[in-house]
Amino acid sequence: MEQLSCKHRSSSVEAEAQLCRQTESRSTQLPRMSVMRHLFLLSITFLVYTLDSAKAYRATETLCGGELVDTLQFVCGDRGFYFSTNNGRSNRRPNRGIVDVCCFKSCDLELLETYCAKPTKNERDVSTAPATAIPPLSKQDLYHKHHHTKSSKYDIWQRKSIHRLRRGVPAIVRARQYRLLMEKAEEAEQALSHRPLTTLPITRPLRLQQASEPSHN
């Protein structure tokens, strides 16, 4: 009996030891898993941040076609823009146009502004221009010019006479004729409206004439 009780005690001790080992292994696995999860989440966030920053500040941003034209119009505004810049220093080396740069390399705001057209002379510069740039016209020149324009207009009118006849009566003349016809119709209607309803006869009736004749006799 004592041997059996010892065996039971030993088996129970071994079971307790196994339970203790299992609980210890679980307790050690939990913090390890939590640390791994934290590291994994941190690595994912860092990767997303680097990708976003690379997209925001990447140097390979390109613009082509209609997008390039729209952005140039937006940046330059009323000044206008050129597709290529010409520097007067050296004409041997041709400059690349904005299409070659922005479509195949990279494009930014500073580069776009270099292709904007420079504003021309101001109004003050135009007003201070010498008056001898446009010589004044004399009266004789004006007369000749006016006479020439008149004769040329007359020639054109003569040339177009055939076309005018083919076209028929002009619209203005047709409108005038229509207006005259309408006026005549209105006058006729007014005359009819002012006419009396009953007209008195000029001659006497026959009965009255016969009655008046014996009285005279």
UniProtKB/Swiss-Prot annotation:
Region B: start and end of each range?
57-83
Keyword Signal annotated: yes
Q: Which GO terms describe its cellular component?
A: extracellular region; extracellular space
User: In Gene Ontology terms, what is one molecular function of this protein?
Assistant: integrin binding
Q: Where is this region: D?
A: 118-123
Q: Where is this region: A?
A: 97-117
UniProt xrefs under SUPFAM superfamilies: Insulin-like
Q: Which organism is it from?
A: Xenopus laevis
Q: Which domain of life is it from?
A: Eukaryota
Compartment list: Secreted
Site residues (Important for interaction with integrin), renumbered to this chain: R79, R89, R92, R93
Q: List the disulfide bonds.
A: C64-C103, C76-C116, C102-C107
Question: Is the Cell cycle keyword given for this protein?
Answer: no
Homology family = Belongs to the insulin family.
Q: What is this protein called?
A: Insulin-like growth factor 2.S
Q: Which residues form the propeptide?
A: 124-217
Please, one GO biological process term? nervous system development
